Regions:
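Intrinsically disordered, low-complexity regulatory regions of eukaryotic proteins
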Residues: 1-166
Length: 166
């Protein structure tokens, strides 16, 4: 099967001398996502809106701090924090959730608690990686079905880590 643009990252991972090609693809996706985030994209309105909304997990924030473009990170974090503070003030002004009576069902979380929990679980970079990784997995299955050369490459690989094997 002729190599297509969508098969290149998968072939590169299976060609590399690594213990787990899936981990290799994730590392490459993470490296690309960090470079994309810290590149000129941080000045684009749609990307800035996404980073303002999603923010970054602690792992990826640490990696962003290690990059050279500190001004770009400062701009992203400034607009993200301004949006977060504005959203939290609006939610705090609404007040706590109504309490149930003595024998009532448990009350739902206050909206501000739900907002904070959702912010802790969101990350712009994790989202980019997950979105692309699903496509890579689909590509692996497609190539395994259609490409005998890839099937041999797959069989000759060292296998997968326990995380990706499961």
């Amino acid at each position: 099967m002729a190599e297509q643009i969508y098969t290149i990252p998968v072939n590169d991972a299976f060609d590399s001398e690594c213990e787990c090609p899936m981990c290799q693809m994730q590392r490459e996706l993470e490296r690309n996502a960090i470079e994309y985030t810290m590149g000129p994209s941080y000045m684009e309105d749609d990307n800035r809106a996404m980073t303002d909304k999603l923010g970054f997990c602690s792992h990826h924030l640490r990696l962003l701090y290690q990059e050279k473009n500190r001004l770009g990170l400062a701009l992203m974090m400034n607009t993200h924090m301004n949006k977060t503070i504005k959203d939290m003030k609006e939610l705090a002004a609404k007040g706590p959730a109504a309490k149930a009576g003595l024998f009532g069902k448990s009350t739902p979380n206050a909206p501000i608690v739900d907002y904070i929990e959702s912010m802790e679980k969101s990350c712009f970079i994790c989202g980019r990686i997950d979105n692309m990784f699903v496509r890579y997995v689909d590509t692996i299955f497609h190539m395994w079905k259609k490409d005998t050369e890839f099937r041999e490459k797959f069989a000759d690989s060292r296998g997968f880590c326990t995380y990706h094997y499961g």
